[in-house]
Amino acid sequence: MAQPSTTYKFELNLTDLDRSVYESVKQTIARHPSETEERMTVRLLAYALFYNEQLAFGRGLSDVDEPALWEKSLDDRVLHWIEVGQPDADRLTWCSRRTERTSLLAYGSLRVWEGKVVPVANNLKNVHIAAVPQEILETLAKDMPRVIKWDVMISE
């Protein structure tokens, strides 16, 4: 029998000085049985970094046609597609064609991946890539509690 997803409660107190966003948000998120704590942590970071009222978690690992997070318009167009991890160049190209803006938070051992994917991504005008430092990610993901409370301040 398949293992069920693990449910987490996430409370985010967000202060984004650059965009004048001051929000307190509560979410219930599911962690797929095959999803690592690091991947879930990067999804939460992406939620904080790109937050807006229309941003939603995708089905992620259980549906390859959906991103980790996305922002949709009221007429169901995808405005912002957010991936996490190390997708291949074909996946990034495919994602970029379905949205106005594509963002990727990459993590893990990036040296080989970077050499293969970044040259292709540089030719895609609507793709933006940021790397999450592994040491910080490991600290955040270690012993992830079922109730997560983050205070995040963003400033350039």
Which ranges hold each PLM region?
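Short, well-ordered alpha-helix to beta-strand connector turns
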Residues: 52, 99-100
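Conserved catalytic cores of phosphodiester-cleaving nucleases, focusing on short active-site segments
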Residues: 69-71, 76-91
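Acidic-basic catalytic patches of nuclease active cores, encompassing PD-(D/E)XK
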Residues: 16-61
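Long amphipathic N-terminal alpha/beta scaffold segment
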Residues: 55-74
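Short connector loops at helix/strand junctions that flank enzyme active sites
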Residues: 64-66, 77, 97-99
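Short Lys/Arg-rich amphipathic alpha-helical segments
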Residues: 92-96, 109
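Helix-rich interaction surfaces within compact, conserved domain-sized segments
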Residues: 2-32, 101-103, 109-156
